[in-house]
Amino acid sequence: MIGNNPVALVYYRAGYSPADFKNTEAKKGRELIEHSSTIQTPDLWMQLAGMKKIQQALTLPEILNQFAPKPWIPQMASTFVKMHSLVEDTQAPGESLKAMDLANKNPESWVLKPQREGGGNNYFDKKMIQKLNNMTPSELKAHVLMERIRPRSHSAWLMVQGQSDYTSCVSEIGRYGVLLANRGTIELNSDCGYLVRTKSEDVNEGGVCAGYSCLNTLCLEEKGVP
C-alpha cells in the first residue's frame, strides 16, 4: 500500500545484485512484496529462472526434454553453446573435472559466469584461470563455464557519453518475452520483440547500463539489391 492505495505492479530496476540487499530492511522489503498480491516484474521465481545455472541445466538433453516439445529440441539445441557445471552433478557425472580441464587448456575459448545480470561480472582469459584456481566449493557452485560466442564483426558508430566512435563491432540479439502466471497457472506467454546490444569488438563484457555496449536496431537488407 502507498497511503490507502494498493500497489498493482512492481518493476525491479534494482534487486539483481547482493549489494542491493546489504541490510535487513532491504531483505524484508523484498519478502513483503513477494508475499503480497502485487504483480512483480520479475517475481523471485522468474528471476531465478533466468539465472545462468538454469541456462546451463537446459543445455542437457534430459532436462530440456522436460520443458520443450520433442520436435523443437534439435533446432533449439543447435543454437546453444557448451555450458558446464563446476561441481559434480548427478545429471552429468564428471562434468566439473571436464570443465576445469577445458578452461585450463584453452582459457581464450571460455568465460566464467556468476549468477549475476547487468554486465561487468564475468571472468576471461588469465583472470578466469586465477579465479577458478582460488574459488571455494560454495563459489564454484555459484558459477558456470560457458563457451565463448564469436559473433561476426561489422562496422558501426557507437555513441557513448556524447562521444561518437566509428569502429569494428559485434552485436548481440535477444528476444523479449512476456510471461504472466498466477498460482502456477500461465495466463500469458508471448514473444513481443527484440533487443540489440552493440559493442566494440575488443571489449569482453556486455551490458548497456554497465557502459560496455550501446542499444542498436536491426536493418534488413535484400541480397543483390543496391
Task: Spell out what each predicted region is.
Residues 1-225:
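Domain-scale recognition of functional cores that engage charged ligands
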